Amino acid sequence: MIKEYLKKPSLSDVQLTRDTRNIPIGKVGVKDISYPIVVMDKNKSFQNTIARINMYVDLPHHFKGTHMSRFVEILNEYREEIALDKLELILSTMKEKLGASNAHLEMEFPYFVEKTAPVSRAKSLMEYTCTFSASLSDRFDFVLGIKVPVTSLCPCSKELSSYGAHNQRSIMTVQVRYSEFIWIEDLIDIIEECGSSPVYSLLKREDEKFVTERAYENPRFVEDMVREATVRLLNMQNISWFSVEAENFESIHKHSAYAAIERSRES
């Protein structure tokens, strides 16, 4: 059966047929591929995790389509070594095998860090959502992103209320370009200091007392949080560009509060 199939005339390549609309496409490819990757871990050398991967290339105006299967073939080609130090090589392979000028690779994955409760010293794993965003045209570009949960306590509510202050869980999202390698754990530590208190996955009663009192003594607006992060990130000479966002999931309002700052070393 297979031999008979192979004897048939070759199948036409519709993707390579000419498109007459004369419109190039900036990004075309595949999204949301679940795939194992390896991430460098400050304490354990490396960490295996599962990423949701997007892969794109540009498409010249004269081609009807790209070859979608080649994206997955490239992932399988690097199946044992999908890691940060291989991203540029993977992008180069994408450009070569898909005849592209630009290639883009996006990965979102859970990353786990062992955290110690502040008083009981109980240890537990904390999950953080991280992203790798890489592209290759004439040069390689890479952006590391992390979503860091924190607690925020409202300074205005503390000032006005006789019985405490409203507080909530917040998400701070940081993205950085760097000239020298930065550990994910170090970036998490920096951002956690910008809220009213860090968030933990395991707290005993004595820890809860400590965390809530710390938050009360350290009230922060979203504006305070992104400004604190900006001060700390500007002091890191190996960061050439960053963006930082804070979103408070307000406990007494229907809306969320939001603030964002973007800076480059040149500016």
Curated annotation (Swiss-Prot):
It catalyses: GTP + H2O = 7,8-dihydroneopterin 3'-triphosphate + formate + H(+). InterPro entries: GTP_cyclohydrolase_FolE2, GTP_cyclohydrolase_FolE2/MptA. Keywords: Hydrolase. GO terms for molecular function: GTP cyclohydrolase I activity. Its EC number is 3.5.4.16. GO terms for biological process: tetrahydrofolate biosynthetic process. It holds the Pfam family GCHY-1. It comes from the Bacteria. The record marks 154 as: May be catalytically important. The keyword Hydrolase applies. Pathway: Cofactor biosynthesis; 7,8-dihydroneopterin triphosphate biosynthesis; 7,8-dihydroneopterin triphosphate from GTP: step 1/1. The keyword Hydrolase applies. Belongs to the GTP cyclohydrolase IV family. Converts GTP to 7,8-dihydroneopterin triphosphate. This is GTP cyclohydrolase FolE2. It comes from Geobacter sp. (strain M21). The lineage of its organism: Bacteria, Pseudomonadati, Thermodesulfobacteriota, Desulfuromonadia, Geobacterales. The gene is folE2.
